[in-house]
From Swiss-Prot:
Principal location class: cytoplasm
Name of the encoding gene: ahcY
Signal peptide: none
Annotated transmembrane regions: none
Cofactor: NAD(+)
One annotated GO molecular function: adenosylhomocysteinase activity
Name of the molecule in the record: Adenosylhomocysteinase
Lineage: Bacteria, Pseudomonadati, Bacteroidota, Bacteroidia, Bacteroidales
Function: May play a key role in the regulation of the intracellular concentration of adenosylhomocysteine.
Highest taxon, organism lineage: Bacteria
SMART domains in the cross-refs: AdoHcyase, AdoHcyase_NAD
Length: 487
């Protein structure tokens, strides 16, 4: 009865006015999807043994009691399990998505109905997106978070840019061309007009941030090098049980899921161009080859290029590949990987997509403003662009994450690895005082995350004898590898 009453109570608030600092308990697409979301969350919990083990281990001691956790991370079913783990460990949580297309509306509804403040829906505008981020950063009484779960670094960036603007408002008037930066500056101007010290107060209370993805980690290291980082950070992305699993095995399954749901195209026999051969690129390349595609790889790093070649992939430049490919996938985390001059030369109905965090790997803006271009929307997140010469390309998810924009992202099991790391990082940051720097979780915790997932898939681990451990200079219980070991 309580659950039904809660659902009815919440429903009346959906899609009300969007004042700068809202008093809404949540904002989602459709709260009536909560029951559907709850059923899928129940299924996902069985596939996420790491998170469930942390609930069992820390449920009574509640190491996050008193923590105000703000999350900016794809609002999916798997993320719902993470959120409810943080709550079970004692935290007060507010959440938004880190991508305008990645929210699963039934997951957001289920979390909202459970009493967590979530501001996310699939198909947000960029203005909506930054408004949602602001709401997630705004706890009761105008307080900010004590710890942050970030994916891509946008929550961290909002605080840092806002902080800088309070010192020098002119930073918000600098010329920017990316629409997301334009909208960020616009909302920060409104915040500054209302409260000229907000971000200084918020930053002072943040004990740290744990960052999920490569792009966000790059931002953190850059701020640290420039002396601008305002609080400690954990680089979760480079934990072995994240980068070598989520990035590799997750993409190996979710890329094909996104492409097929969007286009129903036959991959076998196609030429697929994978831009980048890091962990994400490796997963994507092997995925496409497993479907029977001929895979071409582009790379700037000679080591990664050699790895690709030794795996049997043809390593070429985009200048050559753009004329040959049927499907293009960017995986680099860099800008301008597929330029408009490449798209001009592509085959008719070439499929172009991205599985890196931001849409700037593909020159989407240049495509939209190309003289004489004609856009035809096929269905949500699938657009066909006709060039004046008659050929067309199909852009998926508007150049944003194809696996989350056109499908539901990585499977639950592999996300349990990543989110177990996130939870451990949150416990560390909240309970210990770190100097301002960028850190990684220690090796023994990385191994523990892996260990928590072995039983689920039937793994039986061999145990070292004391003599064997002494011979190679490790403890019987680990860690088993040096920090520099590359796996």
């Amino acid at each position: 009865m309580f659950y039904l009453c809660t659902t009815l109570y919440f429903k009346q608030f959906t899609f009300m006015s969007t004042e700068l600092f809202s008093t809404l308990p949540y904002k989602v697409a459709d709260i009536t999807l909560a029951d559907f979301g709850r059923k899928e969350i129940d299924l996902a919990e069985k596939e996420m043994p790491g998170l469930m083990a942390l609930r069992e281990k820390y449920g009574e001691s509640k190491p996050l009691k008193g923590a105000r956790i703000m999350g900016s991370l794809h609002m999916t079913i798997q993320t719902a399990v993470l959120i409810e783990t943080l709550v079970a460990l004692g935290a007060e949580v507010r959440w938004c998505s880190c991508n305008i297309y990645s929210t699963q509306d039934h997951a957001a509804a289920a979390i909202a109905a459970s009493g967590v403040a979530v501001f996310a829906w699939k198909g947000e505008t960029l203005a909506d997106y930054w408004w949602c981020t602001l709401q997630a950063l705004n706890f009761e009484g105008g307080k900010g978070p004590t710890v942050i779960v970030d994916d891509g670094g946008d929550a961290t960036m909002m605080i840092h840019v806002g902080y800088e603007a309070e010192n020098n408002a002119a930073v918000l008037d600098k010329e920017v061309h990316a629409e997301d930066e334009i909208e960020l500056n616009a909302i920060l101007k409104k915040v500054l007009a209302e409260d000229k010290e907000r971000w200084h107060r918020v930053a002072a209370e943040v004990r740290g941030v744990s960052e999920e993805t490569t792009t966000g980690v790059h931002r953190l290291y850059q701020m640290q090098e420039e002396g601008k980082l305002l609080f400690p950070a954990f680089n979760v992305n480079d934990s072995v049980t994240k980068s070598k699993f989520d990035n590799l095995y997750g993409c190996r399954e979710s890329l094909a899921d996104g492409i097929k749901r969007a286009t129903d195209v036959m991959i076998a026999g196609k030429v697929v161009v994978v831009c980048g051969y890091g962990d994400v690129g490796k997963g994507c390349s092997h995925s496409m080859r497993s479907y029977g595609a001929r895979v071409l790889v582009t790379e700037v790093d000679p080591i990664c290029a050699l790895q690709a070649a030794m795996e049997g992939f043809e390593v070429v430049t985009m200048e050559d590949a753009c004329k040959e490919g049927n499907i293009f996938v960017t995986t680099t985390g860099n800008i301008d990987i597929i330029r408009i001059d490449h798209m001009e030369q592509m085959k008719d109905q070439a499929i172009v997509c991205n599985i890196g965090h931001f849409d700037n790997e593909i020159q989407v803006d240049a495509l939209k403003h190309y003289p004489g271009i004609k856009r035809v929307n096929i269905k949500p997140q699938v657009d066909r662009y006709y060039f004046p010469d008659g050929h067309s390309i199909i852009l998926l998810a508007d150049g944003r994450l194809v696996n989350l924009g056109c499908a539901t992202g990585h499977p639950s099991f592999v996300m349990s690895n990543s989110f177990t790391n996130q939870t451990l990082a949150q416990i560390e940051l909240f309970n210990k005082k770190y100097d301002i720097n960028v850190y990684r979780l220690p090796k023994h915790l990385d191994e523990e995350v892996a260990r928590l997932h072995l039983e689920k898939i039937g793994v039986k681990l061999t145990k070292l004898t004391p003599e064997q451990a002494a011979y190679i200079g490790v403890s019987v219980d680990g860690p088993y590898k040096a920090d520099h070991y590359r796996y």
